[in-house]
Amino acid sequence: MRFGDFLDREKSLFSNDVDHHELKLKDEIKKSKFLIIGGAGTIGQAVTREIFSREPKKLDVVDINENNLVELVRDLRSSIGYISGEFDTFTLPIESDEFEILLQDRGPYDYVLNLSALKHVRNEKDPYTLSRMIDVNIFNTLKSLRLSQKMGAKKYFCVSTDKAANPTNLMGATKRIMEDFLQFEESATLVSSARFANVAFSDGSLLHGFQERFDKRQPLSAPNEIKRYFVTPKEAGELCLLSCIFGSHKEIFFPKLYPENDLISFTSLASRFLKSKGYKPIIMDSEDEARTFLHEITDGTEWPCYFFDSDTTGEKIAEEFYTKREDVNLNRFDKIGIVQMKKVLNNKTLAEFMSQMNTMKKSKLLMRDEIKNLIYKLVPELSHKETGKFLNERM
């Protein structure tokens, strides 16, 4: 299945922007050294491919997922092949001493791209994963930025999310706080970011789940009213690359997608997915009925789906890329908008947040409500609705 066909796009959303800047991209990449952190995820692999295909002087990729790193190398070797510059991968966490030694031994790098993130709304369900999400999305970002500054990197890029604009869940709020931390860091290393739409069929996404359910002969399940913007993996890689190379200091790139034309419901995507497989959806009234139906299929043309009204904590009916309070430039690129980061917090508030989180962890006493209250202090616009139910309680 071609991702673009699935999203009714004949070519990449950013093809005009990439074509317009291609010569500058190739020239800058060919003479530069890159470090990609979190390069084994869907977005990380897409960014790695975009850079690798343009012959960088050096490209090192770091991730904690060794299996995905192996597949990344196999994919590049089996498609693009080899480059004249250096290329290698390393199975390391940002928090480790080995990561710092890697930068010491193989650096300095001109560009550092941090694609690592805990991205799922369901991660806010317990204090342990929520604390880890804060570490990965906020503190690890700050650490890798400071290490980049120390070695004299020209540019630091990190990925944000559309959920950071008017957040309704704690995951989006952590990315909003990450943006605030970036705003307060002053150094010679330039910083840019990108707020993403959903990446179609990315690891762990609902669309990826559709493929998994189909392969395992299981029913599809999706919330009725939830709509999302989507980009393909290639588009995700292009957006990151353009922000990294051409983004000015403390700018956030986002795809120019609009609610009247580009928001797509998960239920309609489920129907498109099944149609692409030669099936049509048959709507079930419950999870049990959907699970049972597959054992009773006779003609092989129908696939059970359970669509339900969303009732889980942190869900947002439709995402957005910027707020009314933010300065936005819609003119510099064809299909990319730009938000200029603003200082909305003071440095003392951010330091207190970091100190209180560290105190909680050292005391070995993590409480979800306390962590949530700390987040609220930094993101007062957080519109968070507790329903008492989380996505792990859904099919």
Describe these PLM feature segments:
Residues 9-32:
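A short, basic/flexible loop-to-alpha-helix module at the beginning of a structural domain
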Residues 36-37, 61:
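Hydrophobic Val/Ile/Leu positions in short beta-strands of Rossmann-like dinucleotide-binding domains
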Residues 46, 50-61, 77, 83-85, ...:
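NAD(P)H-binding glycine-rich loop region in Rossmannoid oxidoreductase-like domains
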Residues 43:
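Hydrophobic/small residue at the entry helix of a nucleotide-binding pocket
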Residues 114, 118-176, 184:
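Conserved Rossmann-fold NAD(P)-dependent oxidoreductase catalytic core, especially the SDR/UDP-sugar
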